[in-house]
Amino acid sequence: METQNLTVVTEFILLGLTQSQDAQLLVFVLVLIFYLIILPGNFLIIFTIKSDPGLTAPLYFFLGNLALLDASYSFIVVPRMLVDFLSEKKVISYRSCITQLFFLHFLGAGEMFLLVVMAFDRYIAICRPLHYSTIMNPRACYALSLVLWLGGFIHSIVQVALILHLPFCGPNQLDNFFCDVPQVIKLACTNTFVVELLMVSNSGLLSLLCFLGLLASYAVILCRIREHSSEGKSKAISTCTTHIIIIFLMFGPAIFIYTCPFQAFPADKVVSLFHTVIFPLMNPVIYTLRNQEVKASMRKLLSQHMFC
């Protein structure tokens, strides 16, 4: 519609990953395969933890939260992405774009804070084992879970607020396969220097600080592991290694995307694809392959339901 000779943008055109039809078909098949693994994999972890009375430790409670976040995160982007692969015109309304952006940052930040909580849990378990059951009691676990979900909500509200006050009256082509702050900001018909700085502070700097803090925490934990017996040391190192791998997979793409908002890189879409599709798949795979208790419980659960 026309208002004072300015066209108010009511929808965005997503340019997608590539313009090649053959490449789109290949990516469609690969993404569909990944997605069909992500959802069952994560829900299997949740169901396994809920159904096994032996998996009641805080570590498994937080692992269940992680699986839920991963499943939800992939659900925000992947289904629409698959539909767009089969559509000639990839259009998303302004409201749908803002909604997608909100849930992406809500769940993404929640997962980031969850990794911090899991690092705290491992620190208490390894560095203060005699006080572990007192500190990490069920009430504390639920409180920490509430805090991380609330933290993700606040972070997402800030991200959405950065977008809502911007005027969009010109170009409406988003050079991506989903709505995210860096691409949307570039379409605003006003100077966005301050907004991009705020985005760096809210997303990029926060991700970087959490990343460095987590690495420092696990460095301290690994140093303390030397005091454990051989059996305890092996299990602790395995758990910490798993967490460190997840940290790099989570924070690497996030830091790349949100600390460089002023310029676009050819690898941006590939990094975004990894962050939204590949990473949620890697979490359950890494945890189940490296955690003997979860693997044993999962095998038991599957055998019960397959041969009942």
Curated annotation (Swiss-Prot):
Odorant receptor. Belongs to the G-protein coupled receptor 1 family. GO terms for cellular component: plasma membrane. The chain crosses the membrane at residues 26-49, 58-79, 101-120, 140-158, 196-219, 236-258, 270-289. Disulfide bonds join C97-C189. One of its GO terms (molecular function) is olfactory receptor activity. Keywords: Cell membrane, Disulfide bond, G-protein coupled receptor, Glycoprotein, Membrane, Olfaction, Receptor, Sensory transduction, Transducer, Transmembrane, Transmembrane helix. This is Olfactory receptor 4N5. Residues 1-25, 80-100, 159-195, 259-269 are extracellular. Residues 50-57, 121-139, 220-235, 290-308 are cytoplasmic. It is a multi-pass membrane protein. It is found in: Cell membrane. Glycans are attached at N5.
